[in-house]
């Protein structure tokens, strides 16, 4: 009897815990915060399924989704705004059906429901192939439970919808079920750090009675259909995650999309009865061949581009160096063209239109750059990549949606120079830090794999401050900093936006001591291939208290807070580059003062020399010398390394907060 009871309980435990419309007063007691103490909503259930069914002429895919959400406070009111994107192409489309949405509130111990009016569903056209259905659930309050259910019938049956088991709110039950006929073989691509509560599959058989065209008339229009009965084997896959904590953004991350628990599908092979298996998933060479022929990508790189000849000849007139030719063309495009979209896989306008309008998306501008380089007789190709904010590319699978960015590359004397003419402050042969996101591909018949890893970016910053007394009892100083290359890029953006004067006003404000700044200048501000150098003089009025002067020797260069806030982390630390931050202070003591206290020297190594923090202090006569160096050897660290990295930075923060104390001589 006990065994039977245990079996029943175990079976119930594996069933979905919610059904549409079955909301009781007991459900309103659900206020679990152990998964996230700051939660504003709880996803009580998120259940989806995809299955093949009978359509007008062939299979359709039926996607169903049901969600039950508890609204804890007003910060989650946006959960009541629902958007469903649908695709259409030619005569085929995805149709939204059976929309049900209800808000439940507990009033005087009774469950009161408010249903969505069918007239409250609106349609928004995004482009020629996409529309968005939108609606907002009514009467949502703090404490409400909302339910949403809908079906999407798709005439694109082979594109299975992906599923995210994790998001920005805690999820008590997330389930996805897929039924696949034996004719279609898919690759399952999953990611994340949570274990499945249930992961199983079972086989069965199902009969589909389809009507298919038996002959075609003039122009290919169907004039007759016949009935076909198919009984393929069916494999049902089911994945469930339970009690999933939200994944929240922290410092040093590319995008949460790389790390949430998620599954997607790619059709690999079609195998119909009595037919040879047909591979569907492309290979990298085939994928690149398609792009090279695609008129919306590289198909026009070497066609009908005679209009470029005159400009290219003018730019390269009298130049014999291939590198200088490439530089002149690159600078011309960078300085004269405006990017309208920094996330675009395909070109929406021709190279000629881009050339004439002097604007375009990232693909359009950099494809035009490639065409101009080729017109100059240079060996140039596009490179396809994904930016850090877009997500990772799967090296094994050529999936177009994983890419969102095109840059150019030119080969000169066996050396490759990557270029991106959409960013106004990049030097020749440089890419923006957002492009360093791992796997990339050369768009050429060879489809060569390239890698732009953050670990390959070694960025050094060197700062020096000289401080000494002036004739008015104040401290005067000189500040000089050679910024990292990518901080230089940000600096140039700020100066363009605000002007040098306002830039230095912000510097003065951020110095963390009462200073007056003067003689500010920035060297290499317009020399984009070099790091910027910031120089200024300042006067500091030291605060004296009971004959003591307290100074923070790191001033504005201190690491003031630990960038790693959480006690633990379930995804990697992904810095944009490998830092080497150097700071020196030369301090001449003001007359009549001695050093009462100063930081002690320390050297801390991280992980057997993979990082080092040096804080060295010395005094010789009335001169104090201080040096700080924070250097790492990698940009990326695993979750297992997080605690030690966090502790390492905690040492840096505490040391940088220490003060020099000067005492007035009696």
Where are these regions (language model features)?
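A carboxyl-terminal module marker
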Residues: 504-666
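Sec-exported extracytoplasmic/periplasmic mature domains
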Residues: 72, 151, 313-317, 334-338, ...
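Beta-strand-rich, non-transmembrane domain signature
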Residues: 12-282, 290-291, 351, 364-370, ...
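Bacterial Sec-dependent N-terminal signal peptides
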Residues: 1-16, 666
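Alpha-helix initiation and N-capping motif
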Residues: 64, 173, 281-285, 294, ...
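Secondary-structure boundary elements
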Residues: 284-357
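Extended, non-catalytic structural segments that build the interaction scaffolds
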Residues: 313-318, 463-464, 570-575, 595
């Amino acid at each position: 009897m006990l065994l039977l009871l245990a079996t029943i309980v175990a079976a119930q435990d594996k069933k979905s815990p919610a059904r549409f419309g079955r909301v009781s007063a007991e459900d309103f007691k659900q206020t679990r915060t152990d998964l996230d103490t700051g939660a504003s909503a709880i996803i009580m259930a998120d259940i989806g399924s995809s299955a093949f069914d009978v359509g007008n002429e062939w299979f359709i895919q039926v996607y169903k989704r049901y969600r039950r959400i508890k609204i804890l406070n007003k910060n989650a009111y946006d959960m009541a705004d629902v958007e469903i994107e649908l695709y259409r192409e030619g005569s085929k489309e995805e149709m939204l059906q059976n929309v049900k949405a209800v808000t439940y509130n507990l009033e005087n111990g009774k469950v009161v429901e408010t249903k969505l009016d069918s007239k409250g569903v609106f349609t928004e056209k995004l482009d020629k192939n996409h529309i968005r259905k939108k609606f907002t659930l009514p009467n949502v309050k703090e404490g409400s439970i909302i339910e949403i259910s809908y079906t999407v019938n798709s005439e694109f049956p082979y594109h299975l919808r992906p599923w995210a088991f994790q998001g920005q709110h805690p999820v008590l039950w997330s389930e996805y079920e897929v039924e696949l006929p034996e004719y279609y073989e898919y690759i399952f691509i999953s990611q994340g750090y949570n274990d499945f509560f249930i992961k199983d599959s079972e086989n069965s058989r199902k009969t589909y009675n389809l009507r298919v065209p038996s002959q075609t008339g003039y122009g290919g229009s169907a004039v007759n259909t016949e009935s076909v009965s198919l009984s393929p084997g069916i494999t049902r896959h089911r994945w469930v995650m339970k009690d999933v904590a939200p994944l929240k953004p922290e410092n040093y991350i590319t995008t949460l999309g790389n790390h949430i628990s998620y599954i997607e599908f790619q059709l690999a092979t079609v195998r119909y009865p009595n037919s040879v298996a047909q591979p569907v998933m492309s290979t990298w060479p085939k994928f690149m061949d398609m792009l090279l022929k695609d008129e919306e990508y590289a198909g026009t790189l070497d066609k009908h581009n005679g209009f470029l000849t005159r400009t290219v000849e003018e730019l390269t007139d009298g130049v014999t160096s291939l590198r200088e030719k490439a530089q002149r063309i690159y600078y011309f495009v960078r300085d004269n063209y405006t990017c309208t979209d920094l996330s675009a896989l395909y070109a929406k306008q021709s190279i000629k239109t881009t050339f004439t309008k002097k604007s375009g998306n990232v693909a359009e501008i950099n494809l035009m750059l490639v065409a101009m380089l080729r017109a100059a007789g240079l060996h140039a190709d596009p490179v396809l990549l994904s930016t850090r904010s877009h997500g990772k590319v799967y090296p094994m699978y050529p999936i177009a949606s994983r890419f969102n960015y095109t840059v150019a590359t030119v080969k000169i004397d066996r050396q490759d120079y990557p270029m991106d003419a959409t960013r106004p402050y990049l030097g020749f042969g440089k890419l923006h830090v957002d492009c360093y996101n791992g796997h990339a591909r050369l768009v050429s018949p060879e489809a060569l794999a390239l890698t732009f890893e953050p670990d390959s970016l070694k960025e050094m910053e060197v700062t020096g401050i000289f401080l000494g007394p002036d004739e008015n009892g104040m401290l005067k100083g000189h500040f000089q900093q050679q910024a990292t290359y990518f901080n230089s890029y940000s600096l140039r953006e700020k100066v363009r936006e605000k002007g040098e004067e306002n830039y230095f006003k912000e510097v003065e404000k951020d110095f963390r001591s009462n200073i007056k700044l003067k003689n500010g200048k920035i060297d290499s501000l317009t020399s984009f291939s070099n790091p910027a150098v910031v120089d200024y003089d300042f006067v500091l009025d030291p605060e004296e208290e009971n004959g003591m002067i307290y100074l923070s020797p790191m001033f504005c260069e201190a690491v003031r807070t630990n960038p790693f806030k959480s006690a633990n982390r379930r995804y990697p630390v992904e810095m944009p580059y490998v830092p080497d931050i150097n700071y020196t202070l030369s301090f001449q003591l003001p007359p009549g003062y001695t050093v009462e206290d100063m930081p002690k020297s320390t050297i801390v190594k991280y992980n057997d020399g993979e990082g080092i923090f040096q804080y060295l202090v010395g005094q010789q006569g009335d001169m104090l010398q201080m040096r700080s160096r924070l250097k790492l050897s990698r940009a990326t660290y695993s979750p297992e390394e997080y605690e030690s990295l966090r502790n390492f930075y905690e040492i840096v923060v505490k040391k940088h907060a220490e003060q020099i104390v000067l005492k007035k001589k009696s």
